[in-house]
A protein has these predicted regions:
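N-terminal signal-anchor module of multipass membrane proteins
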Residues: 1-68
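Structural signature of hydrophobic alpha-helical transmembrane segments
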Residues: 11-26, 67-84, 135-145, 209-219
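Membrane-helix interface "capping/anchor" motifs
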Residues: 91-105, 230-240
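Generic multipass alpha-helical transmembrane bundles of integral membrane proteins
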Residues: 112-235
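Interdomain regulatory linker/hinge segments that flank or connect interaction modules
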Residues: 207, 225-288
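PDZ/PDZ-like groove recognition
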Residues: 282-316
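Conserved PDZ fold ligand-binding element
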Residues: 314-336
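PDZ-domain C-terminal substructure recognizer with occasional recognition of PDZ-binding tails
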Residues: 338-382
Length: 382
């Protein structure tokens, strides 16, 4: 019965529903843009929603075990303010991803308020902020640890199918492609809230008694999102850099959790280190955007692979975005029409000569079945 109530609370949680709704509208926008630029939807599947629910249940369950074992305690005022801020952030995520900024500002503010009373016990904290001052810095760092740990786990499942292409006009008349990945989920984290917050509304909801104090189990919706953009970098390199960056932040939050629980006064200093790392990575990324590199651009020495539709002959041949098809069935191709004509030379089999984004040559081949899509699933410049 209690487990069913947990599932009901997860499903009707407004933040979870808001995230799923925004993700659905983002899916509709993706399909619209793909049909606008390429006259076809690259992937009609609403995979965003499937991964949203899958990640929420899997990582929510695993991380809830951690929060329950460590007895994560949050005040109801903190939770409600957090839920309101994250709900606004999720709505705005249709246009801009503010997930990390909002979380760092909110958690940093909480650690700052808690640190005021730690540095000066005589300092009077306003009544409206008292519930924030009661939260230990180590608990806040634990939430950040769950945040970065989940982001790192989500990152490992990403592949080129998740990156969406968009066409831009270059300065020299060539058309360029920018790839972007946007993904999000909301984890249902079980935390402890002093008092009978839910029990007063749902009498059968369990209450825990620890140290002579009553606690209510509450599901905290932890919003987690990813936004990655590619201009002049390969998918593999971008994912590797994002992984290394997230691992560094994760290490800092783990250290902050340990020190914050045993030596709360150190929390503000560890958080400053985290902010410095975030700022440094932002500056480095901006500086890199100004450097020279290979664009995903239209070419006259073959045809550029803009995207690969899943479960097609092109996907079976392991074609990657940025590849340049030089030959098809031993015929040189430089335009879409030439590529299509070369495919007609052998309607049952296709053999390609390809130059990768890094400049290496490779061969790829695959059988073509009767139900294979036009142009074997390769999306080209139109």
């Amino acid at each position: 019965m209690e487990f069913l109530l947990f599932l009901v609370l997860l499903i009707i949680n407004p933040v979870v529903l808001c995230g799923l709704l925004v993700l659905f509208f983002s899916y509709l926008r993706r399909i619209k843009n793909e049909r606008k630029y390429f006259r076809t939807a690259i992937n009609n599947d609403f995979f965003e929603g499937r991964y949203y629910i899958k990640n929420a249940l899997k990582f929510g369950f695993l991380n809830s075990i951690i929060t329950m074992l460590l007895g994560v305690e949050l005040t109801k005022q903190w939770i409600f303010v957090y839920m309101g801020i994250m709900a606004v952030g999720i709505i705005l995520s249709f246009y801009v991803d503010l997930n990390s900024i909002l979380l760092l500002v909110f958690t940093g503010g909480t650690i700052g308020i808690a640190s005021l009373s730690l540095f000066d016990e005589k300092m009077v904290i306003p009544a409206s902020l008292q519930s924030f001052a009661e939260i230990k810095p180590g608990i806040i760092f634990l939430i950040l640890t769950v945040f970065y740990l989940t982001k790192l786990s989500m990152l490992k499942s990403y592949k080129q199918d998740f990156f969406q292409p968009k066409i831009y006009n270059g300065k020299r008349g060539r058309r360029l492609i920018r790839y972007s990945l946007r993904d999000q989920t909301v984890l249902p984290l079980i935390v402890l809230v002093p008092g009978n917050l839910i029990h007063s509304l749902i009498p059968v909801w369990p209450i825990l008694s620890l140290g002579g104090q009553s606690f209510t189990l509450f599901v905290l919706p932890l919003w987690i999102s990813w936004t990655l953009k590619l201009w002049r970098n390969s998918v593999e390199m971008e994912l590797q850099k994002a992984k290394a960056d997230t691992q560094q932040k994760l290490v800092i939050t783990i250290i902050g959790t340990i020190l914050g629980l045993w030596f709360p006064i150190t929390g503000i200093f560890v958080f400053i280190i985290l902010l410095l790392l975030v700022g440094l990575r932002f500056v480095q990324r901006y500086a890199k955007m100004k450097r020279k590199g290979k664009w995903y651009a239209e070419t006259h020495d073959g045809i550029r692979v803009v995207a690969v539709r899943p479960e097609t002959p092109a996907a079976k041949m392991n074609l990657e975005i940025g590849d340049v098809i030089i030959m098809c069935n031993r015929i040189h191709v430089t335009t879409e029409s030439e590529f299509y004509e070369a495919l007609q030379k052998n309607s049952a089999y296709c053999k390609l000569k390809i130059r990768t984004y890094e400049g290496q040559l490779k061969l790829a081949e695959s059988a073509i079945f009767a139900d294979s899509p036009h142009e074997i699933g390769v999306v080209l410049f139109r």
